[in-house]
Amino acid sequence: MNAPHMHDTAADGAAIEATVADIADTGRRALTRREQKEAYENNKLFKRIVRQVGQAIGDYNMIEQGDKVMVCLSGGKDSYAMLDVLLRLRERAPIDFDIVAVNLDQKQPGFPEHVLPEYLTQIGVPFHIENQDTYSIVKRLVPEGKTTCSLCSRLRRGILYRVAGELGATKIALGHHRDDILQTLLLNMFYGGKLKGMPPKLQSDDGKNVVIRPLAYVKETDLEKFAELREFPIIPCNLCGSQPNLKRAEMKALIRDWDKRFPGRVDNMFSALANVVPSHLMDTTQFPFASLRATGQADPQGDIAFDEEPCASGDDTAATRDGARPIAARPISIVQFDDL
């Protein structure tokens, strides 16, 4: 099934740029200097997010010719932004792919079930609402006052994998962003004893699906501003009554504090995920330390590698480009941005 071209969505995206650029209607007042600056910043934000999503898709070959991408839409800012940008990119991409939005209605009390169907119908996006009462299952199995997110996530994941097969989707798109990836890295380091993050592309647990995260390069603060600018009909994420994941909240606060007090630090952390040197870590499954012998030949990964450590210069910004994507990633994209 070929999804229709989203002319209304294109107009929505163009509306940002129109607002941003100028008021063409001569009958309306001119923008003040402050309004012009705000419009300029909004335009930069929109272009930056589109560019970063396109870059992530290109770097990891997330979307290919003929794909049917199942965009998982929760009603939160991240999934709305992901759908919005993917629709924009599809119009300009040199490949053809379909998009279908999917929401899992878990029957949480107070969930506004009309919001997403109305929104998706308005913008002309094919969608499927999957009704599954996982809320009752979670409430029955998890003690009162405990965090339900882990069990809820597992149940939701299994259902979405099944739905992807039923819809013929070749890719499952999730709305995790750069900060989610870094939070997961720190959680695994601090509480799991693992150097493990959240990959931008992976094979699903059942081996039948490919999961992609198109927002992998995008900062959460940018998504917050974008959602406010686009006025998405946000659905609260606390309807289930679950206690917040305090450890993840702690990591989120830590990252935001670092980003504010030490410019470049968080960008370098993110860049490090794409610049791994197994010979300088301690995992014997990733590097053959036991069989290592002197070869008599210079080794670029030997002691000389320590001569270029950036801590001597104090430069916290050299490892990234545009403050978002790792410079090690290949500079390719599924879309040209010259005229964005």
Curated annotation (Swiss-Prot):
Cofactor notes: Binds 1 [4Fe-4S] cluster per subunit. The cluster is chelated by three Cys residues, the fourth Fe has a free coordination site that may bind a sulfur atom transferred from the persulfide of IscS.
Keyword list, A-Z: 4Fe-4S, ATP-binding, Cytoplasm, Iron, Iron-sulfur, Magnesium, Metal-binding, Nucleotide-binding, RNA-binding, Transferase, tRNA processing, tRNA-binding
Cofactor: Mg(2+); [4Fe-4S] cluster
Listed pathway(s): tRNA modification
A biological process term (GO) from this entry: tRNA thio-modification
Motif PP-loop motif, residue range(s) on this chain: 74-79
The UniProt record lists the keyword 4Fe-4S: yes
GO molecular function, a single term: tRNA binding
Binding site for [4Fe-4S] cluster: 149, 152, 240
Main location: cytoplasm
Any single GO CC term annotated in Swiss-Prot or TrEMBL for this entry: cytoplasm
Catalytic activities: cytidine(32) in tRNA + S-sulfanyl-L-cysteinyl-[cysteine desulfurase] + AH2 + ATP = 2-thiocytidine(32) in tRNA + L-cysteinyl-[cysteine desulfurase] + A + AMP + diphosphate + H(+)
CDD domains noted in UniProt: TtcA-like
Complex and partners: Homodimer.
Note: The thiolation reaction likely consists of two steps: a first activation step by ATP to form an adenylated intermediate of the target base of tRNA, and a second nucleophilic substitution step of the sulfur (S) atom supplied by the hydrosulfide attached to the Fe-S cluster.
PANTHER family xrefs: AMINOTRAN_5 DOMAIN-CONTAINING PROTEIN, SULFURTRANSFERASE-RELATED
Protein name: tRNA-cytidine(32) 2-sulfurtransferase
Native source species: Burkholderia ambifaria (strain MC40-6)
Gene: ttcA
